[in-house]
Every structure is written in structure tokens, then in C-alpha cells.
Swiss-Prot record:
InterPro entries: Iml2/TPR_39, TPR-like_helical_dom_sf, TPR_rpt. Signal peptide: none annotated. This is Tetratricopeptide repeat protein ttc-39B. Pfam families: Iml2-TPR_39 (PF10300). PANTHER family: TETRATRICOPEPTIDE REPEAT PROTEIN 39 FAMILY MEMBER, TETRATRICOPEPTIDE REPEAT PROTEIN 39B. TPR repeats lie at residues 297-330, 481-514, 522-554. Gene3D superfamilies: Tetratricopeptide repeat domain. It comes from Caenorhabditis elegans.
């Protein structure tokens, strides 16, 4: 398959000067002060180091007082956690898990001892007697517990560890709620330094706001069960808290809250919803963060995502490449960019470029070789510039590997890997991967990203029509329905509602004949509902969404349930319990 190369940016934009950005922290003097506000200031400096790609220096700075300061301990554990999640390396996971355990023990020493009764009912009475360190220890403890829980999910894939992680998350949430009681009790803050209060408030609001936001994406059936045990998933309240923290200039959590908001609008709203970000909010938040971290890999990535979603794909490609070139310490940051570049080139039907990035991921990343191999297979199949005999030989070899590369987490198969395995298995019997590349782009919200670019969408419709005319005589009913489903999606984004509806009805009328692609009818029903929402026929839309949700046991079922929940939310409805 030849030597792996990374395609250069195809952008019309002139590349910035190669002069390396020199920030204020290239030459640092460590502070050994253990005063609370000094340790918070050190953590703020470390955050800037990390976000400006000074990863090793940031880790070294936090390790200096790791066993003496709760903020250093929390910061050090957070850095190790990020590294472990990126590398998926067993040694990194074990190191982060051990640091997380020790961090909780260190922070525990700073906490005020209290009974359960005092935790629930006596926040004000107890709080005003607490020292500044004891107050902030509650905050640090909640954060460290969350990291420990997440590491448990990643590190141990058994059911007992899953339960342990869930209990840690519940304790973490309860601790944040206790911090909220302290934050809202005026007597607690009488006579204290204003900065101590502001740092505490920003951390508490950010923790609760992030929790509320993430819980709000869960289907009502799950959320209502969680509410019984004390969780709350109010999206409006979560957004309000995060925007409040973002405005608290000078606090440790202000830039972090801005990053959470950007991540929500630019990534999570697509992964766990219908892709309806508030781009105006993103455009307001971006300048302040790019001023803080102008050449940081993470900020360049976020800027690229904003450009991608705004429709400037060439500029997005340019900034993804800039993110890659900005640092070489954490190679795993590159993999996130490769993933995005794979799709960015796919949107423009540069299949050889997409295949190249899939090949890079398959070679370098440990996250899911099953998915990467499948992507290489389908993009290679779509690339008509490759000689047919060589293409078929490569596709057959790749498709045969996909199912055997699946992994399990907590004893469970990963839904997207199961989907890829089934599609690859079907190829071995039908010799067809017709429109598999467009289908994957659909499931990963590609049409929501480029849907407003009518020229691009029309190009995809023309390409599908051309290929269909060549292949339709040898296609089965599943391929037939997939063609009309994807064409319907494209026509919906072109606002050709009557034609789109006809395509979805063609799929639904043949539901009983579909053998493998049983996920098409529920997704076609959902797409019909989205048509009705755009026509403001909300009652009919809700009926269709309920019907789509009633389907069971098909590939990527949870992904559709998240979309249904998000669509219900746009109409002010909650998904039913049953």
C-alpha cells in the first residue's frame, strides 16, 4: 500500500511565520510557597504552560510540590490522566491511576472532618468554621474523584470496576453540591479574602455546570432515574453556570469554562446531538483564548473545528495541520487532527487523502484499529483513481481483518466497532461497499457540518446518482434503500422537502425486505421528523420521533437515541420513560 504520507494543507491561506511563539513562561522561577492563593497561581501558570505546548515543563512544575499542595496534586494527576487517555498505554494508565489514588489521599488530609448529617443539613454552621484550605479541599477532592472514576473506566474493563467508578462519580457530584451550599452561604465568607471566594465559586460553578450539561444529553429514561439518586441535568442551568465562570476573569477556571463551552458547541453537540452549535458564542470566546494560547495545539484544533463547522473547509485543513506542526511531544494530539482531516477531505470527496489519514491512524493510534481499518477499506473502495484490480485486492484484504480487530470494554462490545464488523462481514458475501463512505460520514454528523454548503451537497448527490446508475443492476434491496436514504438526507439539507420525503418513504415501504441494514428504517423515520420540525409541524414530528425511538436492536441504536433526545429538546419536549 506504499509509504504513508500526510497530505499537506490545500489551503489558499499563507502559512504563518515559522518564528516560534515565546510565552512568558519559557524561563520560569518556581514558587515553593504553600499558601493557598500561591498554589492556585502556580496551577494557573501550569495551565498556560500546558496549553502553550510546554507539556513536560507543566508536568515538572506540578510534580515539584505534588505531595504537599492539594492544587499541585490535582494538577499533576490531571496531566497524567490526559497523557494516559491519549496514549492508551498500560504503563501510563497505571501511573495515572496510582497518582490519582495518592492525590485523593493527600487532599483528604486537608479536608474538614464532618458527619453525614452535617454534610446534608449543616453546611452553613460548619462552613463558617472551616479554614480557606479546608474549603478548597472539598473542591479539589471532587475534581480528583472524577479523574479517579474516569481512570477506573479506562484502566479496568470489568463490571466491578464500572460500579466502583460510578460510585466515585456519585460522591464527586455530592461533594460539588456540598460546595454549592458553602458557596451560597454568606456567613461562610465573612472576613475572608475575596480571591479565595472567587476561586472557590469559579471551581464550584464549573464543576456543577459541566455535570448539568453532560447529564442533559442523556435520554429522559436514564436522566429521570439519575434524578432519583440526586443528579440534575438542567442544560439551561449548566450553560448559565459556565458562562458565569467564563466571565470571572483572573480565576483558574475562567479559561477552562470557556474551553468547556467551546467543546460543547464544536464537538459534543455533534457527537451527542443534532449538530446545532451556537457559533456566535464560539466566535466571542475564541479571541481571548487564542491570545492566551496562540500556538497551542489544542487551541489551533478548536479554531480548525470552528472554521470547519462555519463552512470554510480549506481554512480548517490549514489549522488542523498547524495544530499537528505546533508540537511533537504528545503525538496523540496529532491523531485527533488526523481524524478530523480524514473527514474534512472526505467532505470534498478527496478519497485518497481520507484513506491516507485512515492509514496513519491504523498505524499509529491504539484507540480503535477496527474502525481505522474499516475506514481505510471504505475510502480506498471509493477512490476511483486506483487501478481496479489493485483496489479490489486491497479492499478484500482489509475487510477480512475488520471484525477480528474488535475489542471489549467492561465486557461489552463497542457499538461503532460492531457496526464496522457487520458491514465488513456483509462485504465478504455481497462484495458490496456501496456508499459506505457517505454512510459513515452521515453517522458522524458530516451532513450537519457541511449541509449549508449547497454546492457541496449537490456535488454529493450528483456523485451518488452517477455511481448508482453504474451499479444498480447488481445491487440488492439493502443497497437500494441505502442509496435512497442518503439521497433523502442530502435533499433535506438542500431544502427539497418533497423529494427528500419521497426518498425516506421508499425506504420505509421496503422495511420488511431489508436484511442487513435494519438501522435504515428508524433513521429514515427520524429524518422525516426533522423535515417536520423544519416545517414547524411539531405534533407530527413528535409522533415520528416516538416511532423512531420504538425500534429496537439495530446498529448504532444509542447514537440515534441521542439525536432523538436532542431533537425533542429543540421542540421543548422530553423523551418518554418507556
Amino acid at each position: 500500500m506504499g509509504e504513508i504520507e500526510r497530505p499537506r494543507s490545500l489551503s489558499r491561506i499563507t502559512v504563518h511565520s515559522d518564528a516560534e511563539y515565546l510565552d512568558a513562561y519559557d524561563h520560569v522561577t518556581y514558587s515553593n510557597s504553600l499558601e493557598l492563593l500561591d498554589t492556585i497561581a502556580e496551577t494557573q501558570i501550569t495551565l498556560n504552560l500546558f496549553m502553550n505546548n510546554k507539556f513536560e515543563l507543566a508536568e515538572e512544575r506540578m510534580a515539584e510540590l505534588y505531595d504537599k499542595s492539594m492544587y499541585h496534586s490535582m494538577g499533576y494527576t490531571c496531566i497524567l490522566f490526559i497523557k494516559a487517555v491519549m496514549t492508551v498505554n498500560k504503563q501510563d494508565m497505571e501511573k495515572a491511576a496510582e497518582a490519582s489514588k495518592l492525590s485523593c489521599e493527600i487532599i483528604e488530609k486537608f479536608r474538614e472532618r464532618r458527619s453525614i448529617k452535617e454534610t446534608i443539613f449543616g453546611a452553613s454552621a460548619k462552613g463558617k468554621k472551616m479554614t480557606d484550605e479546608e474549603l478548597h479541599a472539598e473542591l479539589c477532592y471532587a475534581q480528583s474523584l472524577l479523574i479517579r472514576a474516569m481512570l477506573t473506566f479506562f484502566h479496568d474493563d470489568n463490571f466491578a470496576s464500572f460500579i466502583k467508578g460510578a460510585l466515585n462519580i456519585r460522591t464527586c457530584y455530592q461533594t460539588y453540591r456540598y460546595c454549592e451550599k458553602l458557596m451560597n452561604e454568606p456567613s461562610v465568607w465573612v472576613g475572608r479574602n475575596k480571591k479565595v471566594q472567587e476561586q472557590f465559586e469559579s471551581g464550584t460553578r464549573m464543576g456543577l455546570g459541566t455535570f448539568s450539561l453532560m447529564l442533559s444529553v442523556l435520554p429522559s429514561k436514564v436522566l429521570r432515574l439519575l434524578e432519583v439518586v440526586g443528579f440534575s441535568g438542567d442544560k439551561v442551568a449548566g450553560m448559565r453556570d459556565l458562562h458565569h465562570v467564563a466571565s470571572m476573569t483572573g480565576t483558574l477556571c475562567s479559561p477552562l469554562a470557556k474551553m468547556v463551552l467551546l467543546t460543547w458547541h464544536l464537538i459534543i453537540s455533534f457527537v451527542l446531538g443534532t449538530g446545532q452549535p451556537d457559533l456566535e458564542v464560539c466566535k466571542r470566546l475564541m479571541p481571548g483564548l487564542t491570545h492566551l494560547w496562540p500556538r497551542g495545539a489544542i487551541m489551533l484544533f478548536m479554531k480548525a473545528r470552528l472554521l470547519l463547522i462555519s463552512g470554510d473547509i480549506e481554512a480548517a485543513i490549514h489549522y488542523f495541520n498547524m495544530s499537528i506542526e505546533s508540537q511533537d511531544v504528545y503525538k496523540q494530539f496529532h491523531h485527533g487532527c488526523y481524524w478530523e482531516l480524514l473527514f474534512a477531505h472526505g467532505y470534498q470527496r478527496r478519497w485518497s487523502h481520507s484513506a491516507n489519514y485512515a492509514r496513519l491512524l491504523m498505524k499509529e493510534s491504539k484507540w480503535s484499529r477496527c474502525v481505522y481499518t474499516y475506514l481505510l477499506c471504505i475510502f480506498f473502495a471509493a477512490d476511483e483513481t486506483v487501478e481496479e484490480g489493485r483496489r479490489n485486492e486491497t479492499i478484500n484484504a482489509l475487510a477480512g481483518k475488520v471484525d477480528g480487530l474488535r475489542i471489549r470494554i467492561a465486557g461489552k462490545s463497542i457499538p461503532v466497532e460492531k457496526y464496522c464488523g457487520r458491514k465488513a462481514k456483509r462485504f465478504t458475501t455481497t462484495n458490496s461497499l456501496l456508499f459506505a463512505h457517505y454512510e459513515f460520514i452521515y453517522f458522524w454528523n458530516g451532513f450537519d457540518i457541511f449541509g449549508k454548503n449547497s454546492k457541496m451537497v449537490r456535488g454529493i448527490v450528483e456523485d451518488m446518482d452517477r455511481v448508482w446508475e453504474m451499479k444498480k443492476s447488481t445491487c440488492d434491496i439493502d443497497d437500494y434503500c441505502l442509496y435512497y436514504f442518503l439521497k433523502g438526507v442530502a435533499l433535506r439539507h438542500l431544502s427539497l422537502h418533497a423529494q427528500a420525503e419521497e426518498c425516506f418513504k421508499i425506504v420505509l415501504e421496503r422495511e420488511s425486505s431489508i436484511k442487513s441494514f435494519t438501522y435504515l428504517p428508524p433513521n429514515a423515520t427520524y429524518e422525516l421528523a426533522m423535515l417536520r420540525i423544519s416545517e414547524q409541524q411539531f405534533m407530527e414530528a413528535q409522533t415520528l420521533l416516538d416511532k423512531a425511538r420504538a425500534y429496537k436492536s439495530y446498529s448504532l441504536e444509542n447514537k440515534l437515541h441521542f439525536r432523538i433526545h436532542s431533537a425533542m429538546g429543540t421542540m421543548g419536549c422530553r423523551t418518554p420513560m418507556m
